[in-house]
């Protein structure tokens, strides 16, 4: 039998029998909101890079934190849904503006790194998301404690590097942070599924978790690629 004559049912690739229909609908809403967040964040970064109307810094960080707190404090129901989506868009926009210092650093080295980092982040995010969706339910939730310990280690490394100013320690922080955030994609995806199965259908807030995972991976991957490119240029001189 010719292998090329076989009929492949692509629909079966996207059937998750271990996830209820209502949760699958919830996940569609989560990823739709995530897509909107990505678009709005890209707009925020674009406005800065092209027009310089907004400057990324402490104000944008405080603004995004304020928006996130406002979103968390606003109850999820049909009456507040549009309001919460607007707050989510504001949070995503300010987060995009907050990326600008990193973008400026990368553009000064090699602008093409931004596209490479975005594509790389997308591949990483999709692969780890599918792994979490196809895996046995709750199989990655045990990572929660390990990931939180990893964040504590990253914090200690940051504090140490404030005194030592070591490039090697900074690079180790970036690589370890990238690994930890990949783990968060697994854990957060399955945690969202479990919350939805237990009746928590707040897709707006759930999209925030995944959005922060994506943005953090993107930021760290950009810096890693930029530093590697910078080192290669130094070696050529």
UniProtKB/Swiss-Prot annotation:
Cell compartments where the protein resides: Endoplasmic reticulum membrane
GO terms (BP aspect): apoptotic process; cellular response to unfolded protein; negative regulation of apoptotic signaling pathway; negative regulation of RNA splicing
Family of this protein: Belongs to the BI1 family.
Function: Suppressor of apoptosis. Modulates unfolded protein response signaling. Modulate ER calcium homeostasis by acting as a calcium-leak channel.
Keyword tags: Apoptosis, Calcium, Endoplasmic reticulum, Membrane, Transmembrane, Transmembrane helix, Unfolded protein response
PROSITE patterns cross-referenced by the UniProt entry: BI1 (PS01243)
GO cellular component: endoplasmic reticulum membrane; mitochondrial membrane
Domain statement: The intra-membrane loop at the C-terminus acts as a calcium pore, mediating calcium leak from the ER into the cytosol.
Matching Pfam families: Bax1-I (PF01027)
Source organism (scientific name): Paralichthys olivaceus (Bastard halibut)
UniProt protein name: Probable Bax inhibitor 1
